[in-house]
């Protein structure tokens, strides 16, 4: 197959999706909790939304679902006292997040490593992502605005690739590839993530991100009496979620909590939600009986990765 140039709009789409996976985490949360209300169907859609996964879920009989679920409950119960606390649920959900992120990265590594030599080169990454090797000259003027935006994102990817390549070899090892795909999971990538975010959002170069910079190019319509709902939501997030010291700007650490998905916070929120919904005797913890009584709810939550763990013996196997 001849690898020719791809349409600019399509070329832009892929890196934008990658960027949105990190910077747009708050949008997914809005879908999960519209107007602050939990959508149980979103839980199932999020990972069981693929029809093949739904089919596998349905194939399991009720007794087998229950057996595997009981095995998972025992593993979540780290102190073996017969109850699941908020902390135990939160720790389990965070472990689940990391497990699936690592599994996905390992699968991607095999796909990207075209010559199966145990390393992913920059050219191999480009071929897998864009069907062609892209080599932008940073200083060449481009007439096409979309192509210019794509070049900017592509060069960012290249910088992240080079940062992940700790040994400066010809390609990324599996561990380095994981650092490239999931920099939030690797300590040596933290500073790079912060600097990348500052370059993107810190327009005046003071080392902080103000509310105006946080909102990007938004300007209120002069004919409107108030900001649109999504702007009000983003302002609320800035003030209440990210600006911890209330100084009206985000320092590098506060910025990190914005641009990197906060798995700990998400996991804690889901743990509290489950206890609130399933704790029949109001003791702030869950017994096996309470969970089995609300089995459908538990299987549409992040505690079982929306039922996915029932099909992954890493979680329900006795030797985890």
From Swiss-Prot:
A motif (Prevents secretion from ER) lies at residues 317-320. The modification Phosphothreonine is found at residue 140. Ca(2+) 5 binds at residues 243, 245, 247, 249, 254. Transmembrane segments: none annotated. Ca(2+) 3 binds at residues 167, 176. It holds the Pfam family EF-hand_7. Belongs to the CREC family. Not known. Binds calcium. This is Reticulocalbin-2. It comes from Mus musculus (Mouse).
